[in-house]
């Protein structure tokens, strides 16, 4: 079978093509099929870039949605959501890509090249991992980079965008390639395609790119984390960067409204609320300790002590249950009502409450467990029902 001509390589802005079906086969898993064409505008998945989406239209008017594209031995196979009988070898077909999908991937890919090139220039960082996700671009570098370094690189990358320099594609000979300094993640057989962004990057790449850096719009690093000796970056470009900025602005506005703070004072307001929360947390801890002591003093040595206190979190439940075991050798339980039933902590000094906890979970639709002396969890019954069950089981 002849190889598929890639119309997107000389012109990434081409959106339509007239082609001929080379082969068609059903896909039993999806209920659709796969179609090989003699030429296509659809970019196949590869090099960290997702495949194009779009449609194939047959002469009889049947329109097939292209959901994925893969290349095998030079042939591009288009996954479609249906395979009518008219889709046979030799049939003419009209292809049309989803341009918004394509241009988004072009913005992300060119933006990644710019940022990767800048990181390489500034820090000697190699791009050791790259993927265009549905929400952000993931980039992995070979060396650690500080927050200040990333901020400087982000600014330098956007300066390349503002310069609106051309994105150049070339196919050097082996002799020319040997003298060329360029980025590449792997050894490439056959003709090497070089994408050059003057002042930023020279890289071997098979993907689709914008014509100029200005079409990238903006490059924004959303997040970074240490990863395998380097950093993993979450990056957005173009329209994604705009949408991310709008979302950040909306979140900031909501936080500002809640805290009665202006946009440039939200961080100060959050710190103030956090300090207040921390102080209240310590106060709450002390008040609970006094309450737990008082409840423990009501317990008679050797008798069961089951106490219900509204509003306790798991830590509070555990603290109360342990405090009760210091006052009695009987069965101890701390309970608190929840939206779905009851949170509990069952404990006993020198005892094993695991079997009792298992029985409670079975009887009252609960879940939880722990160590012999203390088990914690929740169930669907009210605190009164839990207390009644525990007392009945421990008679």
Regions found by a protein language model. Name each.
Residues 1-395:
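A glycine- and charged-residue-rich anion-binding loop/surface
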């Amino acid at each position: 079978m002849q190889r598929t001509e890639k119309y997107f390589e000389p012109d990434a802005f081409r959106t339509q093509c007239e082609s001929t079906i080379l082969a068609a086969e059903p896909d039993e898993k999806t209920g659709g099929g796969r179609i090989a064409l003699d030429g296509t505008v659809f970019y196949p998945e590869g090099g960290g870039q997702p495949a194009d989406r779009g449609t194939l239209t047959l002469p009889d008017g049947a329109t097939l949605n292209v959901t994925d594209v893969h290349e095998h031995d030079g042939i591009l196979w288009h996954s479609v959501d249906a395979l009518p009988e008219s889709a046979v070898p030799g049939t003419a077909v009209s292809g049309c890509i989803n341009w918004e999908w394509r241009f988004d991937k072009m913005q992300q890919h060119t933006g990644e090249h710019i940022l990767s090139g800048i990181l390489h220039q500034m820090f000697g960082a190699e791009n050791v991992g790259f993927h265009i996700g549905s929400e952000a671009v993931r980039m992995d570098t070979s060396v650690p980079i500080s927050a200040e370094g990333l901020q400087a690189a982000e600014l330098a990358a956007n300066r390349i965008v503002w310069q609106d320099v051309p994105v150049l594609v070339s196919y050097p000979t082996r002799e020319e390639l040997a003298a060329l300094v360029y980025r590449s993640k792997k050894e490439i057989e056959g003709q090497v395609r070089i994408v050059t962004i003057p002042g930023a990057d020279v890289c071997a790449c098979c993907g689709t790119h914008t014509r100029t850096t200005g079409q990238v719009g903006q490059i924004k690093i959303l997040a970074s984390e240490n990863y395998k000796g380097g950093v993993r970056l979450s990056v957005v470009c173009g329209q994604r960067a705009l949408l991310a900025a709008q979302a950040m602005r909306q979140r900031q506005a909501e936080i500002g409204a809640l805290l009665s703070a202006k946009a440039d004072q939200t961080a100060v307001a959050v710190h103030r609320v956090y300090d207040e929360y921390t102080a209240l947390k310590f106060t709450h801890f002390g008040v609970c300790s006094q309450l737990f002591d008082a409840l423990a003093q009501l317990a008679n040595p050797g008798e069961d002590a089951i106490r219900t206190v509204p509003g306790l979190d798991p830590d509070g439940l555990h603290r109360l249950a342990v405090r009760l075991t210091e006052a009695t050798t009987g069965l101890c339980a701390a309970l608190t009502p929840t939206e779905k039933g009851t949170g509990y902590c069952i404990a006993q000094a020198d005892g094993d409450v695991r079997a009792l906890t298992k029985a409670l979970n079975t009887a009252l639709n609960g879940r939880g467990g722990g160590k012999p002396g203390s088990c914690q969890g929740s169930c669907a019954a009210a605190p009164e029902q839990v207390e009644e069950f525990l007392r009945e089981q421990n008679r």
